[in-house]
């Protein structure tokens, strides 16, 4: 079993918390900067990688192209209201009936909404396929929310050495 990444989780969680704590100050200074880059209709490789990771972990609930489903919201709409640090916090800690946190189990206990349906977003802090690429996933979802890219697989620029 490949569990080497678990040894690094305390450090990664600490870094994630530091990121979440520092993002409001950073985002206030850089409101015009986008987490994605598009040149001649092609996205940067990080955003393309976010598309790939989104379809590996997120599309089952949030639908293809982040449009939502009958049991999970459209990320296109959500990211028009959420700041980046809020999005990261929800993905890392999960959400149960609107409350962030508490869904940190691999199989969280579902609460029941007034309609009798559970409303749970699991925490992904244990999933290296999400945690290691969270910035890329956010970049893809934000590009979709901003309508900067169309539905479907986005064409991408070549991978840069720094990516």
Where are these regions (language model features)?
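Gly/Gly-Pro-rich "capping" loops immediately C-terminal to redox-active cysteine motifs
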Residues: 47, 66-99, 120-127
